[in-house]
């Protein structure tokens, strides 16, 4: 269970003040390969950097999984690291007090002898300060290291080199930084192994045109599952609010994953989602008389509308009927608020 610090308004203000003082000190000191919690850097930049290295021949990855990273930061090590660059001891002591301020677990506040309480402004910065030691060490060794918070990928040009890296990086993290590496989840893998290489929700692929970023299958599954939930017959009792929720979610998802090559996948999900929305509308019409009236109003011949309206077939089947597709075509659904994934993807992806 994740431990959360619940800072008061005063604590939060103080944390923000300390953070504002430390950011100008540490930003120039952080490694180029660190992407999490930095101004003007993102997860998209991180996966594009992995892609860039892969194009240079670094096609084997060491994927490191840290067990409960934020909860297990060693206070003594962190305070000593801070003292290297923070010359005002009062600031260091304030941070020390913050680290030991306690966290809430199952509604009970417990003392903290290790870890950085999540939920405050300061925690992300301290997490980066701690792992910057790791970043700089492997930078000195000439190893490409890409890190987003506690998601770490080291890159090598051969499997053998990656296996040596897994051993040496695990040793450094556990012995020097007193962290726990999850041995079962940490591994060496080809960056093109779609099932095994997953970084920040992305994977890499290659074809005759070169190397490209793609959405990992698990991320696709989660996306489709959420769309299915938002477009369920229960959720869609009122269609316009449901379309708005789908739009907000899908737009955020595409803004994140828009760098990936996924035209065929998006087209497939887009068609499936249109079908789902037609099904919801068909269910909303409920009575055969209402269905008949609406179909005729939308241009379906009366005799055909009567046959469809009185059909006992299931919603999913009828909503894929040619007449229903024509009556509830893309243009009409878009005018009603449908967020066309294919069009949105094209406008986002063109920037990459």
Where are these regions (language model features)?
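Conserved polymerase palm-domain catalytic core
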Residues: 29-191, 196
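Conserved phosphate-binding loops in nucleotide/dinucleotide-binding enzymes
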Residues: 2-8, 209, 213
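Residues immediately flanking
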Residues: 20, 64-66, 157-158, 202, ...
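Duplex nucleic acid-engaging cores and interfaces of nucleic-acid transaction enzymes
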Residues: 9-15, 19, 47, 51, ...
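Non-catalytic, peripheral interaction segments enriched in hydrophobic/basic residues
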Residues: 242-288, 292-296
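Extended C-terminal regions of large enzymes
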Residues: 276, 285-352
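Electropositive, glycine- and tryptophan-enriched low-complexity nucleic-acid-binding patches
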Residues: 16, 20-33
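A conserved non-catalytic segment of reverse transcriptases
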Residues: 100, 176-244, 249-251
């Amino acid at each position: 269970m994740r431990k959360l610090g619940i800072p008061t308004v005063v604590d939060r203000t103080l944390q923000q003040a300390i953070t504002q003082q430390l950011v100008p000190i540490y930003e120039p000191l952080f490694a180029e390969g660190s992407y999490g919690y930095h101004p003007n850097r993102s997860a998209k930049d991180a996966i594009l950097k992995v892609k860039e290295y892969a194009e240079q021949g670094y096609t084997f990855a060491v994927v490191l999984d840290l067990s409960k990273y934020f909860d297990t930061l060693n206070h003594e090590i962190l305070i000593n690291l801070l003292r290297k660059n923070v010359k005002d001891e009062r600031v260091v002591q304030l941070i020390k007090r913050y680290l030991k301020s306690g966290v809430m677990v199952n509604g009970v506040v417990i003392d903290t002898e290790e870890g950085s309480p999540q939920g405050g402004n300061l925690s992300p910065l301290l997490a980066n300060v701690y792992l910057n030691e790791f970043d700089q060490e492997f930078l000195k060794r000439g190893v490409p290291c890409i890190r987003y918070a506690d998601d770490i990928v080291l890159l090598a040009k051969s499997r053998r080199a990656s296996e040596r890296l897994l051993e040496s990086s695990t040793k450094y993290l556990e012995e020097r930084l007193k962290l726990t590496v999850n041995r079962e989840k940490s591994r060496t893998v080809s960056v093109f192994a779609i099932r095994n290489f997953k970084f920040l929700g992305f994977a890499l692929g290659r074809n005759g045109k070169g190397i490209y970023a793609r959405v990992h299958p698990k991320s696709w599954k989660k996306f489709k599952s959420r769309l299915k939930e938002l477009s369920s017959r229960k959720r869609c009792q009122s269609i316009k609010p449901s379309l708005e929720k789908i739009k907000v979610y899908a737009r955020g998802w595409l803004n994140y994953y828009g760098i990936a090559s996924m035209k065929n996948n998006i087209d497939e999900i887009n068609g499936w989602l249109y079908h789902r929305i037609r099904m919801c509308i068909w269910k909303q019409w409920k009575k055969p008389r209402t269905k008949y009236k609406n179909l005729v109003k939308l241009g379906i011949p009366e005799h055909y509308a009567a046959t469809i309206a009185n059909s006992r077939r299931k919603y999913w089947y009828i909503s894929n009927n040619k007449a229903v597709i024509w009556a509830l075509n893309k243009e009409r659904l878009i005018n009603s608020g449908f967020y066309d994934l294919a069009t949105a993807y094209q406008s986002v992806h063109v920037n990459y």
